[in-house]
Structure formats: structure tokens, C-alpha cells
């Protein structure tokens, strides 16, 4: 299957409007960073009960979505779905962008910028989060190599092998990210090995959703039709991923209900948690 890639010219008013919008979002983000650094992490919702605040919600979402954004590239090279090959480079590029965004948000935890050097030179190998640093950097390296084999014609015959390594590594990355929460034995809301497969299932759905939004925007802005058949295939895949995520959520809560020590937490999150219960049923389950 011969694929001809054409770059977007980036000369239309809409393109510059998009750049301006993204620049505005970046400025708002920098303003939020300054506000948090000035007033402390308490403004993000963190306290003795809530171990991570709102920035961490976005960071974990971006990291998990980065793994799922590689879905299309994996289907093209690992599973032999040739119809997805023209869309594979965007998949890899978006995966890198999402991971970089998530890790940038996590940098806020370090406080002063110079503490990054300490984090890079001193590792606590008993910490699952420290081990995840290697998973994140490895994922970046594998995806860059994967993109190179796709974009360089003389390296195309290595694409299936590079895709396989990237696929295995993304599974390890999402498992490690879920284990950050699953190994928090002091927190009843987490403390479950089921969080690892749950994160994998959710990453497939989140990543594909973000990828589709970017793909549809790019194709619409550049006048390139996607086709109803391709969109229908993506819709079926998304339905399967959502069903898998819902399955693991149900199993997770049923497992907690089996153990008496988790009953208070389950009563809180499922019935008596106020806004948290509403967010769970309407946000996570219904939506």
C-alpha cells in the first residue's frame, strides 16, 4: 500500500486563529502556575484526605491518553490494519505531545525548577512513581523510533517491529501509571491491583477520543474528507473501549463491596458523597 503524505500549508486565517487560541491557553496555564506557586498546592484541592489536586487529574489524564492515542498506529502496524496506515504518524505524534503535556504538569510538584536535577539524579527504586520515570522516557524513545520507521521509506520494513515494541511499552506504561494508585495501601479509595487493567481500558477510550477530535479538526480545516466508513469503524472501536472501561469499574467496586473494610468508602462514593457521588454516576458512568 503506497502512502503519500502531504504537509498542511498553514497559511489560512483559521490556522493563525488556532495558533492564537493555543497561545492564549498556554498563557492562562502559566498564570495558573504562578498562582499555585504563590498560594501553595492547597488551592488545587489537596489536603490530608486528597493526595493529589486538580493539576494531577489533568496530568494523569494526559499520560493515560498518551498511551491510548497510539491506538491507530498500533492497529496499522501490529494488527495489520492497512487502512489506518495513513493516519498512523499523527497517532504517534499526538502520543508524544500528550505525554509531554502530562509530565510538564507533574513538574509543578517539584516546586523550584532546580529540583528537577535532584529528581533526575536521585531515585527511590522502592517507589512505583520513580520506576515510572523510566517507563515515560522509554515510551518517548520507542515512539520516536516508531515514527522514524514510518516516515523514512528505507526504514519501513522495520515499522512492524518498532510498532510491536511501542505497543508492549505502552501497556507497561499504563500499568505502571495505574499501579501508582493501586499501591497506595493507606488510601481505601485506591489500594487495588484492578486499577492497572482499569487504567489500560480507560486509556484506550480516552486516547482514541482525543485522537479523533484532533483528526476531525485537522481534516475539516484542510478540506480532507475522512469518509463515513472510517468514522463508523472508529465509533465501533470507541464503543468497545467504553464497555471495557465500564466493566472494570463495575468489577472494581464489586470487589471493594466484598471486603468489609471498604464498605464506608463505597457508601460514600456510591450513595452519600454529595457532589462526589453525582460526579461518579453522571461523569464517570453516564458520560
Kindly give the residue locations of the regions a language model identified:
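Long, contiguous internal "core" modules enriched in hydrophobic/ aromatic residues
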Residues: 4-10, 21-26, 81-83, 121, ...
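Class II aminoacyl-tRNA synthetase catalytic cores and aaRS-like
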Residues: 8-20, 30-39, 80-88
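Alpha-helical transmembrane segments of multi-pass membrane proteins
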Residues: 20-41, 104-110, 173-180
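Membrane-interface helix-loop junction between the first two transmembrane segments
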Residues: 33-49, 75-81, 217
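Peri-membrane helix termini and adjoining interfacial loops of integral membrane proteins
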Residues: 38-43, 114-118, 258-266
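Perimembrane loop-to-helix junctions flanking transmembrane segments
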Residues: 41-53, 122, 268-271
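Membrane helical hairpin/interfacial module
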Residues: 50-117, 131, 135
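Short, structured segments at the rim of ligand-binding sites
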Residues: 126-130
